[in-house]
């Protein structure tokens, strides 16, 4: 990066709590003092950022495909929902995205709020690495196979029944061959990154993010064969609604919906463009999983500890 190149960071804060605003101020001021232009995402409605004495003086943008244009990085301060919305902006212009957790579990965040200053310094120093996370590309077709919607997802595509008094009658399809038909509340098609989110709550397995695969999880399906499936990343997964069933919705990452009238189908393939994910440490995913989900590991000794015990029990040879 040359000295004459303007450095810009898009700051995406969750403003639901006063402590979150304070974190956004800290990050913005550190970046500003380092000579980095700060651009702040705001809501179209009343947003406390617009009138804040510090955050109000920075450039403000609303959520759009061009919000992150010209920036070098998207910095997210919030939980998983905030991260997914920020990832939508970063993905549109192929930028890296870094999440700092200000929420509860914050599975998508790289670091916690108590390390915010260190994280911002790493951004200032360009001291981070970027890894690609698999995404999904989505097409919705009507009963005549005409395209009526397109989208993408980082976590999952949730095919949801809109009639809470009945079930969604659907057929699951892999590589244009039928797998099973059933009545259900919906079907989740997830990436490895999204396997710890909605798909996990619906009974799906956890997939390590380095794995290239597509996870399919029927949601409250009424059939003998309703087990989760892990299919090839080269496959096309489709969910086809029956012509006489309830209307449905294909929802990407919880906030980008495409209506699915009866008889329509949604087709999902591996995304052409990944999300560029900022990493600040080399912590194994196993450790992150245990920490975020607070999994009990009491009594674990590990190979190093077991070796010490074996060495202590082995008598010295003459």
Curated annotation (Swiss-Prot):
| GO MF annotations in UniProt | ATP binding; metal ion binding; NAD binding; NAD+ kinase activity
Q: What's one GO BP annotation on this UniProt entry?
A: NADP biosynthetic process
Q: Catalytic center at which residues?
A: 80
Q: Kindly report the protein's main subcellular placement as a broad class.
A: cytoplasm
Q: Name one GO cellular component term.
A: cytoplasm
Q: Which cofactor does it need?
A: a divalent metal cation
Instruction: Output the superkingdom of the source species.
Output: Bacteria
**EC number in record:** 2.7.1.23
Presence of keyword Kinase: yes
Q: Where does NAD(+) bind?
A: 80-81, 85, 155-156, 185, 196-201
Keywords in alphabetical order, please. ATP-binding, Cytoplasm, Kinase, NAD, NADP, Nucleotide-binding, Transferase
Q: Which reaction does it catalyse?
A: NAD(+) + ATP = ADP + NADP(+) + H(+)
Extract the InterPro entries matched here. ATP-NAD_kinase_N, ATP-NAD_kinase_PpnK-typ_C, NAD/diacylglycerol_kinase_sf, NADK
State the Pfam families in the record.
NAD_kinase, NAD_kinase_C
Q: Where does this one sit in the cell?
A: Cytoplasm
Q: Which HAMAP family match?
A: NAD_kinase
Q: Which PANTHER family does the protein's record reference? A: NAD KINASE
Homology family: Belongs to the NAD kinase family.
Q: What does this protein do?
A: Involved in the regulation of the intracellular balance of NAD and NADP, and is a key enzyme in the biosynthesis of NADP. Catalyzes specifically the phosphorylation on 2'-hydroxyl of the adenosine moiety of NAD to yield NADP.
Q: What is this protein called?
A: NAD kinase
Q: Which organism is it from?
A: Corynebacterium efficiens (strain DSM 44549 / YS-314 / AJ 12310 / JCM 11189 / NBRC 100395)
């Amino acid at each position: 990066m040359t000295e004459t190149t303007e450095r810009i960071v898009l700051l995406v804060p969750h403003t639901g709590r006063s402590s979150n605003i304070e974190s956004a101020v800290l990050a913005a001021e550190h970046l500003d003092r380092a000579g980095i232009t700060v651009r702040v995402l705001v809501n179209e409605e009343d947003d406390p950022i617009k009138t804040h004495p510090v955050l109000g003086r920075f450039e403000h943008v609303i959520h759009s495909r061009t919000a992150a244009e010209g920036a070098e990085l998207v910095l997210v301060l919030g939980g998983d929902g905030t991260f997914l919305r920020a990832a939508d902006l970063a993905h549109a212009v192929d930028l890296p995205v870094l999440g700092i957790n200000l929420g509860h579990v914050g599975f998508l965040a790289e670091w916690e709020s108590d390390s915010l200053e260190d994280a911002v310094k790493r951004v200032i120093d360009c001291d981070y690495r970027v890894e690609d996370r698999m995404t999904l590309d989505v097409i919705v077709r009507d009963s005549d196979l005409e395209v009526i919607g397109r989208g993408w997802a980082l976590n999952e595509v949730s095919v949801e029944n809109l009639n809470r008094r009945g079930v969604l009658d659907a057929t699951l399809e892999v590589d244009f061959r039928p797998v099973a038909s059933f009545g259900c509340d919906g079907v989740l098609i997830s990436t490895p990154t999204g396997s710890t989110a909605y798909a996990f709550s619906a009974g799906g397995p956890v997939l390590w993010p380095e794995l290239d695969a597509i996870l399919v999880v029927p949601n409250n399906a009424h059939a003998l064969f309703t087990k989760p499936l892990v299919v090839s990343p080269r496959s096309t997964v489709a969910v086809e609604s029956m012509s006489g069933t309830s209307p449905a919705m294909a929802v990407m990452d919880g906030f980008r919906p495409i209506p699915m009238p009866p008889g329509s189908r949604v087709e999902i393939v591996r995304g052409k463009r990944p999300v560029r994910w900022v990493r600040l440490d080399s912590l194994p995913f196993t450790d992150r999983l245990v920490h975020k989900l607070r999994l009990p590991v009491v009594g674990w000794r590990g190979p190093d500890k077991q070796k010490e015990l074996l060495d202590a029990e082995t008598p010295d040879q003459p």
